[in-house]
């Protein structure tokens, strides 16, 4: 009986060690919070939705739109979406460390991004656009206000949808592993 318990304990310990090697490990990368308010969540990473797993965090904005949304680190704006569905108004920023931060359901963009979007909308004669600015077209520094929180796209109320992805694969990473509180 004692040997069975010992074998079970060793087996569980070995299993735990093996499985934990597949986990996403926490890192402190120096990223700042995308909002200047406490990060209270209405949706968490990996939650099962009606037809997919949630790939980011839904951060409550205290029932308000128009809160400053900051770049979490320096980088280049690599993609901008304007749509009545999905992420609505969204900004993607590629960072030098190989990660991309995504900010969605925004009410409006910073003046520089807004001017870029408006020019493209007129040129394409379309309100809905998916834009990929060239390298160096839209650079941001850590803490720059890139947009304001909102309720655009397929959103059930004012909040910020925030993601961190691997840039080369677009594989979603759990933002909580970067120490956001």
Regions found by a protein language model. Give the residues of each.
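Bacterial N-terminal signal peptides
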Residues: 10-18
């Amino acid at each position: 009986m004692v040997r069975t318990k010992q074998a079970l304990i060793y087996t569980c310990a070995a299993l735990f060690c093996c499985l934990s090697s597949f986990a996403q490990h926490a890192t402190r990368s120096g990223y700042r919070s995308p909002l200047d308010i406490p990060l209270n969540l209405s949706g968490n990473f990996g939650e099962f939705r009606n037809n997919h797993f949630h790939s980011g965090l839904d951060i409550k904005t205290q029932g308000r739109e128009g809160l400053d949304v900051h770049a979490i680190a320096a980088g280049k704006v690599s993609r901008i979406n304007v749509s009545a569905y999905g992420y609505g108004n969204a900004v993607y920023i590629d960072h030098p460390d190989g990660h991309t931060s995504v900010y969605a359901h925004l009410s409006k963009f910073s003046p520089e991004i807004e001017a870029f979007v408006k020019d493209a909308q007129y040129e394409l004669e379309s309100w809905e656009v998916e834009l990929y600015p060239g390298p160096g077209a839209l650079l941001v520094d850590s803490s720059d206000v890139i947009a304001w929180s909102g309720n655009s796209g397929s959103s059930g109320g004012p909040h910020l949808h925030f993601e961190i992805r691997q840039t080369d694969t677009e594989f979603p990473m759990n933002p909580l592993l970067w120490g956001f509180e």
